[in-house]
């Protein structure tokens, strides 16, 4: 398991995911701040398998130019959890179209 945390660890959900990943012997990558391009780069660089986002992060990822969105290999991703706020249906549908059926709602 390779978990990418784009959210601050003073929130309980990312902190819990980081702790669980470490507990099972996985690798954790923690972003200092969320940057959509850097986020995609890190997924590819570290073959990230698990991540957790908020709907605003989805929106920022979807606003990237197509060339940036398709430049990175995201095939390692197995589970992407979104939480903390309701996700607009259109945003979630666009993310599923892009990443496939790996998006899980935790709200």
What label would you give each PLM region?
Residues 34-35, 56, 86:
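Short beta->alpha linker loops
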Residues 1-2, 10-49, 64:
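Conserved AMP-binding/adenylation subdomain of ANL enzymes
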Residues 1, 7, 78:
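Nucleotide donor/acceptor-binding cores
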Residues 7, 13, 55:
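Glycine-rich, N-terminal phosphate-binding loop of Rossmann-like dinucleotide-binding domains
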Residues 5-6, 30, 81-83:
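Thr-Gly-centered strand-to-loop micro-motif
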Residues 5, 17, 38-39, 57, ...:
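Hydrophobic alpha-helical segments typical of transmembrane helices
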Residues 23-24, 48-53, 62-107:
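Gly/Ser/Thr-rich phosphate-binding loop
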């Amino acid at each position: 398991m390779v978990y990418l945390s784009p959210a601050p660890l003073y929130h309980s959900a990312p902190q819990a995911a980081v702790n669980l990943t470490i507990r099972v012997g996985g690798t954790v990558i923690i972003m200092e701040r969320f940057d959509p391009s850097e986020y995609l780069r890190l997924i590819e660089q570290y073959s990230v398998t698990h991540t957790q986002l908020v709907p605003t992060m989805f929106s920022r990822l979807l606003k990237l130019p197509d060339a940036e969105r398709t430049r990175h290999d995201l095939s390692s991703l197995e589970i992407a959890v979104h939480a903390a706020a309701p996700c607009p249906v259109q945003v979630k549908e666009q993310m599923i179209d892009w990443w496939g059926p790996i998006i899980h709602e935790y709200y």
